[in-house]
Curated annotation (Swiss-Prot):
Lineage: Eukaryota, Amoebozoa, Evosea, Eumycetozoa, Dictyostelia
Species this chain originates from: Dictyostelium discoideum (Social amoeba)
Coiled coil: none
Domain of life of the organism encoding this protein: Eukaryota
UniProt biased composition (Acidic residues): 180-199, 207-217
The protein, known as: Putative uncharacterized protein DDB_G0292438
Segments of skewed composition (Low complexity): 61-93, 129-165
Region entry Disordered, spans: 50-93, 128-233
Length: 271
């Protein structure tokens, strides 16, 4: 079976259960309304009986004034109106209860919903009465789905047969076209590779020409300046990598370099 058919069947089952639960709730509400109407009737009968007893005892009591006596016509009229309304409501309720609900286009058994039976309606009762019909409908649907699947399989087989009946000329033409496309792609790749090689050769030639045209300037060798003649060189010297040159103390003091002076004996002061 198709998964869609299973999903549809599950949806139908859920709808059936929901509808059955709704009928159960409606029936319970109708029973509640009927019980309330019966209670109202009982209360009205009690009130009327009390009123009758009062009217019977009123003429015997001499102390009660006449102005306080309630006329019986109004009570009778009100009681008749109340009873008529209650009867009409009860009759309407009985008519509503007598009409069985319809689920999935099928009428439920009226014996369950009759007020005389006083049988409590449950989901089990509804399922018992309607589950067979529901199963029959599901079986019919499943049979229809199976028939549709068989038809689809037949159509698929026919399509496969039609596909198998493709002529050999079409296959050969397809193979020729594929071979031609492969050859064209190979030729294009070869041409692209040749063009790339030619461009690289041109670039290399240009670079060689530029290197040849460039003139290398000779580097002048800078000779260190030498002092001419012999001069006394002080002991304090600095090495700058070129040679030892005499350095005056003033420049060193200006640079902030600490000098280590030799311990010279102090001159003797004359007395």
């Amino acid at each position: 079976m198709d998964p869609l058919a299973n999903i549809k069947n599950e949806i139908n089952l859920m709808n059936h259960r929901i509808s059955s639960f709704a009928t159960y709730v409606n029936y319970q509400l109708l029973e509640f309304k009927q019980s309330m109407s019966n209670i109202e009737l009982m209360l009205q009968e009690n009130i009327e009986s009390k009123k009758k007893t009062k009217t019977d005892t009123e003429p015997n009591s001499p102390t009660k004034p006449l102005s306080t006596s309630i006329p019986t016509t109004t009570t009778a009229a009100t009681s008749q109106s109340i009873t008529s309304t209650s009867l009409s409501s009860s009759s309407s309720l009985s008519n509503q209860i007598a009409q069985p609900p319809i689920i999935n286009g099928q009428v439920l058994n009226s014996s369950i919903l009759t007020p005389t039976s006083r049988k409590k309606l449950s989901l089990v009762d509804i399922d018992k009465n309607n589950y067979n019909n529901y199963n029959n409908n599901n079986n019919n649907n499943n049979n229809n789905n199976n028939n549709n699947n068989n038809n689809n399989n037949n159509n698929n087989n026919n399509n496969n047969n039609n596909n198998n009946n493709v002529t050999t000329t079409d296959k050969k033409e397809g193979e020729k076209n594929e071979n031609e496309n492969e050859n064209e792609n190979e030729n294009e790749n070869e041409n692209e590779n040749e063009n790339d090689i030619i461009e690289e050769d041109k670039i290399i030639e240009k670079m060689d020409e530029e290197l040849e045209n460039e003139q290398v300037e000779p580097v002048e060798q800078v000779k260190p300046k030498t002092q001419g003649g012999r001069k006394k060189v002080s002991k304090l010297t600095l090495d700058f990598g070129i040679g030892k040159r005499p350095v005056r103390t003033k420049t060193l003091t200006q640079l902030g370099i600490a000098l280590e002076k030799e311990d010279t004996p102090k001159k003797r002061q004359r007395k």
